[in-house]
C-alpha cells in the first residue's frame, strides 16, 4: 500500500484522481501543515472536481435517501444508534447500509474469522464456538466468506432458529458474495440476523475492498478470534487491525507444528491467548 500526499503547491495537482484517493485524515494532516496565501489557487480546481463528480455524488445521495424503500436501511455515524465500539476506531465508516435486524448492533459482539480453506476441525470448532457465544447472549461477527466465516454464521443460530450474527460485506448489501452462500445470507436476513456494508448498494466488491472491510469486523467487536490462518492472510490482517484498535485477540490452536496454523502460532508467540476447543475457550473465560 502507499499514501499519496499533495505536493507543496496545489497547482501541481496533476489530475482529479489524486484528490479522490485522499482520506479524510490525509486531507486533515496536509491542511494542518500548509497555509495557502490565496485560497482561490486551490478552491477553483477543487470546485471543478466537484462539478465533474456531481452526477456521481447525486446518485450516491439518492441511494442513501431512498435506502429504506426496498428493505435496505442506512445508519449514519451521526445517528445515536451507531455502534459505540465502531465509532471509536480511527477510521469509522461514515454510514452503514444494512439488511435485517438493526438491533443486532446493540448486543456484545465477538468476531470469528479464519481461512477459506480451513481444516475440518477449525470449521467444526468455529461453529461450536459461535453457537456457545450466542447462547451466552452475544452476537457473532464475520465476513460471509466460505470456510471459517460460513461456519461461524451457521453456528450463530439459537434454539429458536433466530440468527444472532452480523455479516460484514465488502460490496453492497444487495451484492452478496459468494453466490454459494445465497441461502445462508437469506436465512440471516429473514431470521433476525444482520448484513451490513459501508459500500453503496449495487456495488460489486473489488479485491482491495476486502482488507478495508476487515476494520469493520474487528471494530464492531470487543474480541477477534482467529480460527485458522496462514502467515499472510486476511485473518491475520484482521487480527492486526483488532490489536491496533485496542481490542483483544485470541487464537484457536489445537496442536503445534501444523503448517495450516502457522499464523495462529505466530499470534500466540506474540502474546495472544490460545485455546484448543470451544469448551476450553469458555473454561479460560471463567478461570
Predicted feature residues:
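Glycine-biased, small-residue-rich flexible motifs in mid-sequence functional cores and linkers
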Residues: 3-4, 72, 76-287
Amino acid at each position: 500500500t502507499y499514501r499519496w500526499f499533495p505536493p507543496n503547491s496545489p497547482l501541481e495537482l496533476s489530475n482529479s484522481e489524486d484528490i479522490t484517493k485522499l482520506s479524510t485524515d490525509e486531507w486533515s494532516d496536509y491542511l494542518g501543515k500548509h497555509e495557502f496565501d490565496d485560497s482561490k489557487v486551490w478552491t477553483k480546481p477543487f470546485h471543478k472536481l466537484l462539478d465533474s463528480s456531481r452526477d456521481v455524488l447525486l446518485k450516491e445521495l439518492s441511494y442513501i435517501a431512498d435506502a429504506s424503500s426496498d428493505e435496505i436501511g442506512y445508519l449514519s455515524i451521526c445517528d445515536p444508534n451507531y455502534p459505540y465500539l465502531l465509532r471509536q476506531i480511527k477510521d469509522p465508516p461514515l454510514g452503514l447500509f444494512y439488511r435485517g435486524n438493526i438491533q443486532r448492533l446493540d448486543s456484545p459482539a465477538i468476531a470469528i474469522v479464519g481461512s477459506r480453506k480451513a481444516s475440518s476441525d477449525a470449521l467444526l470448532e468455529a461453529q461450536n464456538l459461535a453457537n456457545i457465544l450466542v447462547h451466552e447472549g452475544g452476537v457473532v461477527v464475520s465476513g460471509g466468506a466460505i470456510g471459517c466465516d460460513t461456519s461461524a454464521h451457521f453456528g450463530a443460530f439459537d434454539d429458536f432458529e433466530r440468527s444472532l450474527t452480523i455479516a460484514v460485506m465488502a460490496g453492497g448489501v444487495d451484492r452478496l458474495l459468494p453466490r454459494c452462500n445465497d441461502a445462508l445470507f437469506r436465512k440471516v436476513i429473514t431470521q433476525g440476523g444482520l448484513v451490513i456494508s459501508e459500500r453503496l448498494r449495487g456495488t460489486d466488491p473489488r479485491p482491495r475492498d476486502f482488507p478495508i472491510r476487515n476494520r469493520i469486523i474487528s471494530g464492531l467487536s470487543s474480541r477477534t478470534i482467529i480460527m485458522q490462518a496462514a502467515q499472510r492472510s486476511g485473518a491475520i490482517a484482521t487480527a492486526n487491525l483488532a490489536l491496533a484498535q485496542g481490542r483483544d485477540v485470541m487464537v484457536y490452536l489445537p496442536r503445534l507444528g501444523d503448517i495450516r496454523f502457522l499464523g495462529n502460532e505466530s499470534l500466540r508467540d506474540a502474546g495472544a491467548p490460545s485455546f484448543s476447543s470451544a469448551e476450553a475457550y469458555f473454561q479460560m473465560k471463567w478461570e
